[in-house]
Swiss-Prot record:
<dbReference type="InterPro" id="IPR025927">
    <property type="entry name" value="Potential_DNA-bd"/>
</dbReference>
<feature type="compositionally biased region" description="Basic residues">
    <location>
        <begin position="524"/>
        <end position="558"/>
    </location>
</feature>
<keyword id="KW-0805">Transcription regulation</keyword>
<keyword id="KW-0233">DNA recombination</keyword>
<dbReference type="GO" id="GO:0005634">
    <property type="term" value="C:nucleus"/>
</dbReference>
<feature type="region of interest" description="Disordered">
    <location>
        <begin position="521"/>
        <end position="573"/>
    </location>
</feature>
<feature type="region of interest" description="Disordered">
    <location>
        <begin position="581"/>
        <end position="600"/>
    </location>
</feature>
<keyword id="KW-0234">DNA repair</keyword>
<comment type="similarity">
    <text>Belongs to the INO80D family.</text>
</comment>
<keyword id="KW-0804">Transcription</keyword>
<dbReference type="Pfam" id="PF13891">
    <property type="entry name" value="zf-C3Hc3H"/>
</dbReference>
<feature type="compositionally biased region" description="Polar residues">
    <location>
        <begin position="585"/>
        <end position="595"/>
    </location>
</feature>
<comment type="function">
    <text>Putative regulatory component of the chromatin remodeling INO80 complex which is involved in transcriptional regulation, DNA replication and probably DNA repair.</text>
</comment>
<comment type="subunit">
    <text>Component of the chromatin-remodeling INO80 complex.</text>
</comment>
<keyword id="KW-0227">DNA damage</keyword>
<keyword id="KW-0539">Nucleus</keyword>
<dbReference type="GO" id="GO:0006310">
    <property type="term" value="P:DNA recombination"/>
</dbReference>
C-alpha cells in the first residue's frame, strides 16, 4: 500500500489518518488506502480518476476524484455547475419552527377574540387561568409521541410498520379533540365565574362534587352590587392538573373515576372545615390527585413485565447444588445485556451440507457457487436486520422504563421505592438460586485393614480410605506415591498430593532434595571463586579485540661462533689468557640462584626434554601466575621488546670500550698490510724481528698502552669483566698476565713464547688483530642495539691515529 509523507494517527482512537504529502490532512482513510477521498488521487494504484473541469479564472483543474467505473468526466459539483444534473434545493432549518410560531399566533389571536381579557380576572386581582406562555404548546407531532403507548412490548415491528398510517390518523383526530376540549374548558370556566351556585343540582356529576378548590380565600371582600347573595366565586383549577371538567363527555369522567379507584392507596377526602373563618388565614383543602396514581400504575406494569421476562430467562431445572463459576456468571450477565437473536445458525455450514448432496460437477460449477453465495448473503442480511430491529426495540424499552421510573419517583417516591425493592429482590433470587440443603455427611472411618485390625483413622471426604491408605484405592487419580528411594534401594511409599511435578516427593525427601541442590550450588560458587586469580595485574580490556599472534616457524640455524683458539700453527699464548669467572658475568639485576635449591632429579628431567621443542606464548599462561610475589624487583620485562636497557654508567663504559675496539681495528688493518708485504723477502722479517726485539716494537705497544690511549690498558687489565658483567667472554680470549702490568712490555713475552723467527713476524699483529676482532664481535653482538645511538667513529682522536700510522711506518 502506497503511503504519503505525512503519516500520523488520530488522537481519539489512534487510527491512521490521511497521509497526504503536500500538507497535513486529518481526515479518515479509505478502506485499503492511505488517503482520504479528497486526496486519494496521490495513490496512482487507486481506482479513481481526476475531474476534467478547468476553472476559467485561474486555469486550474479540479482535484476531486471520480471512480473509474463510472462513465463520466466531471465530479458531482461540476455536473451541477455545468447543468447536467439539477441543483439540490436546501431547506432552511427554521422552517418547522416558523410554522409552529405562526400557527400558535393564529390560535392566540382567535382565543383573544372569543374570550375578553377582563373576564379572566378574579375580583381580588389574581389571574383566574394559568395560560401557557407563547411557544409552550407543542406541535402535533410532539403530541403524537406522548400519545403513543410505551408499554407495547409484545408488538412486532412489522405490525407497527403496517399500522403506522392508521395510527397517525387516529392520533391526529385525538389531538384535534384534545384541542377542542381545551377550548370548551376555557369557555366553561368563563361562564362558571359568574353563574349562581345551585343548591342541589341533580345534573351535577359526582366528580364535580368531589372537586374542591386548592386555594380558597375567605376574606370578607365587598361583593359586586349587581349580583345576588347566593353567588359564590370559585377559583379555577390549575391547568397543569389533569382533572375532568364540567363540559367533558361522560367517557372522560368514567376514565378518571376508574383510575382513581384503581390506585393502590387511595387518598381520603377530608371533611369540610367547621372552624370559623378568619381574615388572616387562607384555608387549604387536600384533594385526591388521581394523576399521581397513574404514574405508579404505569411503573407497576413495567415492573411486572420485567419480572416476567426474568422468569422466562431462568432455567427450567435446578442446579442440583452446583454453583456457577465466575466465568459462567459473567457470560450470563453478557447474555442478559445482549440483544435477542444473538445466536444464529451458520448458513455457510448448511450450504456445505447441501453441496455434499449435489453432484461434484454441479457443486464446483461457477453458477451454483454464485447462487449459494447470493443466498448466504440474503440470509445474513435478514439476520442483521433482525438484530438491528431487536436492538432498537430494546433501547426503546429501556428509555420507556427510565422515563416512567423518573415520573413515578417524582410523584410518588415511597411507592416507587417499594416497587424497586421488590424488583431487586426478584433479581437477586434469579442470579443466586436457592441451593438444596446438603445432606449431613457422617464421619466415616478408613476401610483399610492393618496387622492389628481395622484402621481407626478418619477417611478423606468422598472416599473410604484415610491419607495413609489412599493409594490402595485404584480408582483415585489425585494421590501418588513418593518417587524417592532409600539407601538400600527400597521405594518410599508415602502418599503425595502433587499435580505439578512429574516426580512427586514426600515432605521429607523434598527437604533433602532442596538441601542437596542448595549445597551443590554453594559448592559450584566456591569452586568458581577459587579458580579466579588472587591478584589482577591489569584489568581486561573489554572493548579491545585480542589479536592472536601467529606461531613462528622454526628458526634458521645460526652460524657457529668461531673458536677462541686461532686455526693453524698460531696458538693463543697462555700468558695472554684472562681468567673470567662465569658466576661474575651474570647481570646484577638477576637474583642469585644456587644449585642447592634445585631438586635432585632435575638433571634427569632435563635430559628427557627433547631439544627441538619450541615454546609458544600459550606455554607461559600457566607459569606466570604461579610466580612468587617477591619478584617485583626482578627485571623481567624492561623496554618495549623485552631488551635490557643500559643505565647511564653502563652507557659511558660501553662508549669507552667501543673506542678501544676501533683502535684495535686500526691495528688489525696494519697487520693485514704487513702480512701482504711478508712475501717480499726474509730480510724484511729479520729486520722487523730485530727491531721489534731491540725495543722499538715494545716501545710502540708500550707507548700505545700507556701514553696515547690509556683506556686500552684499563680495558685489557681486567676492567672488561667488571664493567661488563653481562658479556660472556671466552676464557682463552686474553691471558691473565698480559698487559696486567703496565711496565712490562710485549717484546719479552713474545720472544719467550715464539722461538722460531719465521713464525714471529706477524705474531704480535695477528694476536692483537684476532683479539680485537673477537672482543669487538662479542661486544657488538650483545650491545649493538642498545648502544646504536652512542656509536660514533669520529670520536677516535686524530693524534692516536696519526701516531699509530707513524709507528707502523717505522716498523715497516
Amino acid at each position: 500500500m502506497y503511503e504519503g509523507k505525512h503519516i500520523h494517527f488520530s488522537e481519539v482512537d489512534n487510527k491512521p489518518l490521511c497521509s497526504y504529502s503536500p500538507k497535513l490532512c486529518k481526515q479518515r482513510r479509505l478502506n485499503g488506502y492511505a488517503f482520504c477521498i479528497r486526496h486519494v488521487l496521490e495513490d496512482k494504484t487507486a481506482p479513481f480518476k481526476q475531474c476534467e473541469y478547468v476553472a476559467k479564472y485561474n486555469s486550474q483543474r479540479c482535484t476531486n476524484p471520480i471512480p473509474k467505473s463510472e462513465d463520466r468526466r466531471y465530479c458531482n459539483s461540476h455536473l451541477q455547475v455545468l447543468g447536467f444534473i439539477p441543483k439540490k434545493e436546501r431547506k432552511k432549518k427554521n422552517d418547522a419552527l416558523e410554522d409552529v410560531k405562526t400557527k400558535h399566533q393564529m390560535e392566540t389571536m382567535a382565543f383573544s377574540l372569543t374570550v375578553p381579557p377582563l373576564a379572566l380576572k378574579m375580583p381580588n386581582g389574581h389571574d383566574g387561568l394559568n395560560l401557557s406562555p407563547p411557544g409552550a404548546r407543542l406541535p402535533i407531532h410532539y403530541l403524537e409521541t406522548d400519545l403513543e403507548d410505551p408499554f407495547s412490548f409484545e408488538e412486532e415491528e412489522e405490525e407497527l410498520k403496517k399500522g403506522t398510517s392508521v395510527k397517525k390518523k387516529l392520533q391526529s383526530k385525538l389531538a384535534q379533540n384534545w384541542q377542542r376540549l381545551r377550548e370548551t374548558e376555557i369557555v366553561n370556566v368563563h361562564q362558571e365565574h359568574f353563574s349562581p351556585h345551585p343548591a342541589h343540582s341533580p345534573l351535577q356529576s359526582p366528580s364535580l362534587q368531589e372537586q374542591h378548590t386548592l386555594v380558597q380565600p375567605i376574606s370578607t371582600l365587598p361583593k359586586p352590587t349587581g349580583l345576588p347573595q347566593n353567588l359564590v366565586c370559585k377559583s379555577p383549577q390549575p391547568s397543569n392538573i389533569s382533572q375532568p371538567v364540567q363540559g367533558a363527555s361522560p367517557v372522560t369522567h368514567t376514565v378518571a373515576q376508574t383510575r382513581h379507584q384503581s390506585s393502590k392507596r387511595p387518598f381520603p377526602v377530608l371533611p369540610p372545615v367547621t372552624e370559623l373563618p378568619r381574615n388572616d388565614r387562607i384555608q387549604l383543602a387536600a384533594t385526591a390527585l388521581p394523576a399521581y396514581s397513574s404514574y405508579v400504575s404505569r411503573l407497576q406494569r413495567l415492573v411486572k413485565l420485567c419480572t416476567r421476562k426474568q422468569q422466562l430467562d431462568t432455567d427450567l431445572f435446578p442446579h442440583f447444588g452446583l454453583d456457577w463459576s465466575e466465568d459462567s456468571g459473567e457470560e450470563q450477565e453478557d447474555s442478559d445485556q445482549s440483544s435477542p437473536y444473538r445466536t444464529a445458525w451458520s448458513f455457510r455450514e448448511s450450504f456445505r451440507y447441501d453441496c455434499k448432496k449435489l453432484d461434484i460437477e454441479e457443486a464446483h460449477s461457477r453458477s451454483s457457487r454464485i447462487a449459494q453465495l447470493c443466498t448466504y448473503f440474503q440470509q445474513k442480511y435478514k439476520h442483521l436486520c433482525r438484530l438491528e430491529r431487536a436492538e432498537s426495540c430494546q433501547k426503546k424499552y429501556r428509555h420507556t422504563f427510565r422515563r416512567a421510573l423518573q415520573q413515578a419517583a417524582h410523584r410518588e417516591s415511597e411507592t416507587t421505592g417499594q416497587l424497586l425493592q421488590e424488583l431487586r429482590t426478584t433479581t437477586c433470587i434469579r442470579t443466586r438460586p436457592i441451593q438444596p440443603e446438603l445432606r449431613g455427611t457422617e464421619v466415616t472411618l478408613c476401610s483399610a485393614t492393618i496387622s492389628n485390625g481395622a484402621c481407626r483413622n478418619r477417611a478423606l471426604p468422598y472416599t473410604r480410605n484415610c491419607f495413609q491408605h489412599i493409594l490402595s484405592n485404584s480408582s483415585q487419580q489425585l494421590f501418588s506415591s513418593c518417587t524417592a528411594k532409600f539407601a538400600d534401594g527400597q521405594q518410599c511409599s508415602v502418599p503425595v498430593f502433587d499435580i505439578t511435578h512429574q516426580t512427586p516427593l514426600c515432605e521429607e525427601h523434598a527437604k533433602k532434595m532442596d538441601n542437596f541442590l542448595r549445597g551443590d550450588n554453594s559448592r559450584k560458587v566456591q569452586h568458581h571463586q577459587q579458580r579466579k586469580p588472587r591478584k589482577k595485574t591489569k584489568p581486561p580490556a573489554l572493548t579491545k579485540k585480542t589479536k592472536k599472534k601467529r606461531r613462528r616457524g622454526p628458526r634458521r640455524p645460526q652460524k657457529p661462533i668461531p673458536p677462541a683458539v686461532p686455526q693453524g700453527n698460531l696458538c693463543m699464548p697462555s700468558s695472554l689468557s684472562l681468567p673470567v669467572e662465569v658466576s661474575s658475568i651474570r647481570s646484577p639485576s638477576t637474583p642469585n640462584l644456587s644449585t642447592e635449591e634445585l631438586p635432585d632429579d632435575i638433571t634427569s628431567e632435563i635430559t628427557d626434554i627433547p631439544h627441538d621443542l619450541e615454546l609458544n606464548q600459550e606455554d607461559f599462561s600457566d607459569v606466570l601466575p604461579r610466580l612468587p610475589d617477591d619478584l617485583q624487583d626482578f627485571d623481567f620485562f624492561e623496554g618495549k621488546n623485552g631488551d635490557l636497557l643500559p643505565t647511564t654508567e653502563e652507557a659511558e663504559e660501553l662508549e669507552r670500550a667501543l673506542q678501544a675496539v676501533t683502535s684495535l681495528e686500526c691495528l688489525s688493518s696494519i697487520a693485514v698490510l704487513t702480512q701482504a708485504d711478508n712475501a717480499t723477502g726474509q730480510d724484511l722479517s729479520d729486520r722487523g724481528i730485530s727491531a721489534f726485539s731491540t725495543g722499538s716494537g715494545g716501545s710502540v705497544i708500550q707507548s700505545l698502552s700507556r701514553e696515547d690511549h690509556p683506556d686500552l690498558g684499563d680495558l685489557l687489565n681486567g676492567h672488561i669483566g667488571h664493567n661488563f658483567a653481562s658479556l660472556e667472554l671466552d676464557e682463552n680470549l686474553l691471558g691473565s698476565t698480559t698487559l696486567s702490568n703496565p711496565s712490562a712490555t710485549l717484546s719479552g713475552h713474545i720472544q719467550g713464547q715464539f722461538s722460531s723467527p719465521a713464525n714471529v713476524g706477524l705474531s704480535s699483529a695477528t694476536l692483537i688483530s684476532r683479539s680485537g676482532e673477537r672482543l669487538g664481535r662479542e661486544v657488538m653482538s650483545h650491545h649493538v642495539d642498545a648502544a646504536a645511538p652512542i656509536l660514533d667513529k669520529q670520536r677516535v682522536s686524530g693524534a692516536l691515529y696519526s701516531g699509530m700510522v707513524k709507528h707502523s711506518a717505522e716498523w715497516v
